[in-house]
A protein has these predicted regions:
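Residue-level detector of the short coil/turn that links helix A to helix B
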Residues: 6, 46, 87-88, 133, ...
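Amphipathic alpha-helical segments of tetratricopeptide repeats
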Residues: 19-20, 59-63, 98-108, 146-153, ...
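Structural signature of alpha-solenoid helical repeat scaffolds
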Residues: 26, 66-68, 110-113, 153-156, ...
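Residue register of alpha-helical TPR repeats
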Residues: 33, 72-75, 113-120, 159-163, ...
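TPR/TPR-like (Sel1-like) alpha-helical repeat modules
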Residues: 232-236, 271-287
Length: 299
């Protein structure tokens, strides 16, 4: 057993004893806090059923209480929302809406969350909501995350700002706000390029996605040249990652070369298309010889 697991197991034993005692003669506040803490420990240990039981018991207990600490309130709904995501989307949405109802009370560190923890909570909830097409509901979380990082310029914060701008772009696209999405992706690219150029970017694929998604919007708006530029910028990064053996899956690299070649051929840009087709061949993509033959017939 890892040392971290041993620590969690010891903490679990202590909370089992504490909750047993509090159920006899503790206050509701004390019992609620202990249940939320044990739920978190169980979740970290992978005991999701038991963790869910504690989270649900905490939520039911809180409903009869006049005042619930903001940190404890957020934590119990976040815990259950995270665990229920795959099985009960509506309950997850309901739990996250409860968090939204108290986001305005958060201006800095609270119980269960330091500053970084709050930002990660907001980012995680936004990601979950976007994944199930609840785009509008993600907005309070991304806004709160950016508000908390308003004056931050450290490397960690700049990486989070880039990622959150990508989430905003996805949500705006989902809501049909393409111009807003372009602004969000452009901000992500501005931050991401600065991080990438100074080797401080944590996940270069986030920058790739910003270029790809902005390019996709440009293509939908018939700004083909701008799409080509964005997708080729994404390819520069992917090729560099591939050359350094840091690209675990070349699928996106291959697809971008193929799609650019196809788009350029349709526009009569044969020489530019050939470059991408030849690269696709070098990457071992089947069927590219036929595409080359078709391109040559168009000369």
């Amino acid at each position: 057993m890892r040392a971290s697991d041993e620590h969690l197991e010891q903490a679990l034993k202590e909370y089992n004893d504490k909750i047993s005692a509090l159920e006899v003669n503790g206050t509701d506040d004390e019992l609620l806090e202990a249940l939320v803490n044990r739920s978190t420990i169980l979740m970290l240990l992978g005991s999701y059923t038991a963790s869910m039981t504690d989270a649900e018991e905490a939520i039911e207990l809180s409903k009869g209480m006049k005042d619930v600490d903001i940190g404890t309130f957020v934590k119990m709904y976040e815990n259950r929302g995270q665990m229920i995501f795959d099985d009960n989307e509506e309950m997850m949405v309901s739990d996250y809406s409860m968090i939204i109802s108290r986001l305005d009370e958060i201006h800095g560190e609270i119980r269960h969350y330091d500053w970084k923890g709050l930002i990660m909570m907001c980012q995680g909830c936004a990601e979950d909501l976007i994944d199930c097409d609840r785009f509008e509901m993600s907005v309070p979380f991304t806004q709160k995350a950016l508000e908390l990082m308003k004056d931050a310029s450290d490397i960690w914060s700049m990486n989070r700002k880039m990622e959150i701008q990508n989430l905003i772009g996805q949500a705006d696209t989902g809501m049909g706000l393409d111009n807003n999405a372009i602004d969000a992706y452009s901000e992500s690219i501005l931050i991401g390029e600065q991080l990438y150029d100074t080797s401080r970017i944590e996940d270069p694929i986030q920058l790739v996605f910003a270029y790809v998604y902005r390019g996709d919007i440009m293509e939908a708006e018939h700004e083909v040249e701008k799409m080509w530029n964005d997708h080729e910028s994404a390819l520069v990064i992917l090729e560099e990652l591939n050359n350094r053996n840091r690209l675990s899956d070349p699928d996106l690299l291959i697809k971008l070369h193929q799609s650019l070649a196809s788009s350029m051929m349709e526009s009569g840009e044969i020489e530019r298309a050939e470059k991408h087709l030849m690269r696709a061949i070098n990457l071992g993509v089947p069927g590219m010889k036929d595409a080359i033959d078709e391109m040559n017939s168009m000369r």
